[in-house]
Amino acid sequence: MTDSDHRLPDRPGEGDPGRGRRIGIDVGSVRVGVATSDPDGVLATPVETVRREKSSDRHVRRLAQLVTELEAVEVVVGLPRTLADRTGPAAHDAIDVAEALARRIAPVPVRMADERLTTVSAQRSLREAGVRAKGQRAMIDQVAAVGILQSWLDQRRAALAAPGEGGHG
């Protein structure tokens, strides 16, 4: 068993790098959704969908390029644990991408955030907004990345506001 077999989500606010943009990433088998926050870490917005390449690391290079372009201080990758709170194949895949990205962008921290049901929630939001299933494919990964990052930002803000909690943000 490797460390990734026991990988749990990180807690927002721990080791917080302070003010600056964050990037949220939703790792899918075909596409990777990317979102970013404003420098104050209040609002997550979609950035782009990166095509996933199993045979190369081109998608990881593009993610690293976005971290540099957006001057991100922290990256949050969705960890899709099963509803039984286990690390399944999708979670191992996300961990592999996160670790490859972390090697490229050090010392910028890469965190793992619980993302159970994020894609389901994103699909529901798009459906309620009147986006047809066919049109959702192009947007779903970015919307899921926004959900992952917004949840992280909200939890981070609460953790940093709590007495004796969080980092130095």
UniProtKB/Swiss-Prot annotation:
It comes from the Bacteria. GO terms for molecular function: nuclease activity. Residues 1-24 are annotated as: Disordered. It is found in: Cytoplasm. Pfam families: RuvX. Its EC number is 3.1.-.-. GO terms for biological process: rRNA 5'-end processing. Residues 1-19 have a biased composition (Basic and acidic residues). It is an enzyme of class 3 (hydrolase). InterPro entries: RNaseH-like_sf (IPR012337), YqgF (IPR005227), YqgF/RNaseH-like_dom (IPR006641), YqgF/RNaseH-like_dom_sf (IPR037027). Belongs to the YqgF nuclease family. Could be a nuclease involved in processing of the 5'-end of pre-16S rRNA. This is Putative pre-16S rRNA nuclease. It comes from Mycobacterium sp. (strain KMS).
